[in-house]
Amino acid sequence: MAHQKYGAQALLTSIRFGHSTYRSQILARTDDESIKSLADLKGKRVAFVDPASTSGYLLPLKLFKDRKIKTGKTVFAMKHDNVVSMIYQKQVDAGATFYTPPAEGEIQDARRLVFAQYPDVEKKIKIVELTDEIPNEPVVFRKGIPEAMKSKLVDAFIELARRPDGKEALTKVSSITDLKKSSDAEYKAVREMLTALGKSAESLMRL
């Protein structure tokens, strides 16, 4: 949206645990036998993160819309770990959070955020369905920066991400483990999702 309105360019994409894309997951309690597929969430209580969260609301909302599934009462928990906790505590029937594939034999999705409180969360909460993938967040450059300077900045960011101190800093800030070159074309799916939902970047920024 910033590309269309202001001429901004996405020239880098974040990488986490070797993945440059991510998706959302729909979670429910493992012992809830009434929920075996997404269709079973019709009329159920569902927790989302917040109205501006891509993985915690917009991607799941698009999934429900595409499948023509109307849930029951919805709540915004404001944080991904809160969504998981609400499901664990049976405050809601299901919830939507970010999904990251397992790495080194351990889960990396939102359930890991509550391991300290609920060591058995992986057994107690199941993944009902995953959404389609979209690219991780980009590094965006404003309109008007000379091409030569943009090229140097892109290379500098990539070099930073691959230096031990740079990797450590990026990991601490946002769990970013690397960066790769990209383009605005790679974010077409995100723009199409917002259009399908009748959303705009401006409306989400006001939330």
Regions found by a protein language model. Name each.
Residues 145-207:
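An extracytoplasmic/periplasmic, membrane-proximal ligand-sensing/linker region
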Residues 3, 30, 50, 68, ...:
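Sec/Tat-exported extracytoplasmic proteins
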Residues 22-24, 42, 135:
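Residues that flank catalytic or metal-binding motifs in active/ligand-binding sites
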Residues 34-45, 197-207:
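Immediate post-signal peptide segment of exported/extracytoplasmic ligand-binding proteins
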Residues 3, 42, 88, 116, ...:
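Alpha-helix boundary recognition
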Residues 23, 38, 57, 61, ...:
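Extracytoplasmic/secreted envelope proteins and their assembly/folding machinery
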Residues 32-34, 44-148:
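Pocket-lining segment of extracytoplasmic ligand-binding domains
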Residues 1-34, 101, 131:
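Short, glycine-/small- and polar/acidic-enriched structural segments
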